[in-house]
Amino acid sequence: MEMLEEHRCFEGWQQRWRHDSSTLNCPMTFSIFLPPPRDHTPPPVLYWLSGLTCNDENFTIKAGAQRVAAELGIVLVMPDTSPRGEQVANDDGYDLGQGAGFYLNATQPPWATHYRMYDYLRDELPALVQSQFNVSDRCAISGHSMGGHGALIMALKNPGKYTSVSAFAPIVNPCSVPWGIKAFSSYLGEDKNAWLEWDSCALMYASNAQDAIPTLIDQGDNDQFLADQLQPAVLAEAARQKAWPMTLRIQPGYDHSYYFIASFIEDHLRFHAQYLLK
């Protein structure tokens, strides 16, 4: 591992690291915020997954999460949104390829060689964080848009791994919206049954009641992608039918930007703290 940057921030440290990923077959960067140490108890971790076109720095720089994370004693880990590099398959569109990994394991060429973000987030990155930093094994997950999709599927596919999950403007039903259909067709092929494994609505309908964890979703009602790409009401209905403890908040006037995330990130951190710090 190689440290790329380090900055003092709210008495803690904001760092950026590069490491060679055996899962993704390329070097990867991630950012981490380490709150000021309190006692000998290792702090819990909140993983943040960003959206299309982003990398590990968007949330770090724009969301303003460090102040409250420092107060609460929560480590923030921000991975990249895809594998990177000249040897990694890419596409000219912003919504496929590098910067658009969709947090799944691709099965189709040319993507399958590198695009295994799900395995990276489930196994390799948490193991690296555990081995290199003083953190507890308690963790939660959150994300925005494509990253909200990622956070939800990570939680739904891994019962017991996360204490809680939250999302801002998530893509909840990728099997049925243009962003998801384009990505899944390329990464997973034309068998739509294979897509269901990566769709949070389908996963929620298939979930067991004992695996449900507290879930918070914020969605701006002035989001230009709300009707065509996001459709949170579809997941809310699945949650209702499965008695999943999910709160969906529609925030008047807010759009899809980091101004929206910055406005409510404190709520999300305090939400996760209730369960991480038990």
From Swiss-Prot:
Protein name per the record:
S-formylglutathione hydrolase YeiG
Q: Name one GO cellular component term.
A: cytosol
How would you classify this enzyme at the top EC level? hydrolase
Superkingdom in the source lineage: Bacteria
Function, in words: Serine hydrolase involved in the detoxification of formaldehyde. Hydrolyzes S-formylglutathione to glutathione and formate.
Keyword field contains Hydrolase? yes
Annotated InterPro entries: AB_hydrolase_fold (IPR029058), Esterase-like (IPR000801), S-formylglutathione_hydrol (IPR014186)
